[in-house]
């Protein structure tokens, strides 16, 4: 019985170590850049939710993607680095990244607000926004 218990804990320890030793992969050139696509993105010291927060990135912020392990390690334009969940950025090629940076933007100046599907506050909410968020200008159709 003691052997079985020891074997179980040995197996559990090995399984835990293998999960922690995830393969770190540098990003291929066609997705080594990205843009944050949530209003406030928590950047963490390690690629896990329980890790401490190192800084934050805002919607529309262009970032460099350094590596991927299930989480992205990113670098902001002001050279901060941290880990973000894979669902909070849109990875892209250098060409798309440069296109994003050249595009005309709208910068949110209110403390908090919303974007809508149509130019009507009763239409479906697309996202919340906070001061400093950057949105690509798509034109003024339907706006007064």
Residue ranges of model-derived segments:
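Boundary regions of SH3-family modules and the immediately adjacent low-complexity/disordered segments
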Residues: 22-31, 48, 59-64, 76-114, ...
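Start-of-domain marker
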Residues: 28-58, 66-68
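Beta-strand-connecting loop/turn residues
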Residues: 39, 69-70, 140-144
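Bacterial Sec-dependent N-terminal signal peptides
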Residues: 1-27
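Generic hydrophobic-segment detector
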Residues: 8-11, 50, 122-123
């Amino acid at each position: 019985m003691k052997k079985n218990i020891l074997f179980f804990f040995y197996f559990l320890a090995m399984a835990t170590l293998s999960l922690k030793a995830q393969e770190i992969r540098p990003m291929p050139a066609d997705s080594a850049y990205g843009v944050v696509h949530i209003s406030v993105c928590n950047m963490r010291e390690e690629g896990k939710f329980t890790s401490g927060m190192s800084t934050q990135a805002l919607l529309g912020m262009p970032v460099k993607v350094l590596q991927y392990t299930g989480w992205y390690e990113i670098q902001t334009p002001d050279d901060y680095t941290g880990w973000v969940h894979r669902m909070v950025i849109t990875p892209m090629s250098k060409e798309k990244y440069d296109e994003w940076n050249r595009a005309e933007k709208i910068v949110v100046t209110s403390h908090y607000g919303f974007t809508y599907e149509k130019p009507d506050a009763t239409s479906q909410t697309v996202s919340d926004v906070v001061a400093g968020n950057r949105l690509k200008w798509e034109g003024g159709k339907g706006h007064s």
